[in-house]
Swiss-Prot record:
The keyword Cytoplasm does not apply. It comes from Echinochloa crus-galli (Barnyard grass). InterPro entries: Defensin_plant, Scorpion_toxin-like, Scorpion_toxin-like_sf. The keyword Disulfide bond applies. This is Defensin Ec-AMP-D1. Has antifungal activity. Inhibits spore germination in F.graminearum (IC(50)=15 ug/ml), F.oxysporum (IC(50)=102 ug/ml), F.verticillioides (IC(50)=8.5 ug/ml) and D.maydis (IC(50)=12.5 ug/ml), but not in C.graminicola, B.cinerea and H.sativum at concentrations below 30 ug/ml. Inhibits hyphal development in P.infestans (IC(50)=25.5 ug/ml), but not release of zoospores. At concentrations above 100 ug/ml, induces morphological changes such as lysis of hyphae and sporangia in P.infestans.
Amino acid sequence: RECQSQSHRYKGACVHDTNCASVCQTEGFSGGKCVGFRGRCFCTKAC
């Protein structure tokens, strides 16, 4: 199962999944992706 949590450190609109994922990795997650119309960065990890 994969859990998602909105990034606390990511600033601005999320356009590229790779940028979001690298910020999420500094927060202790395995990756991340942009979600939704407004482009929020959500971090993912196995749970």
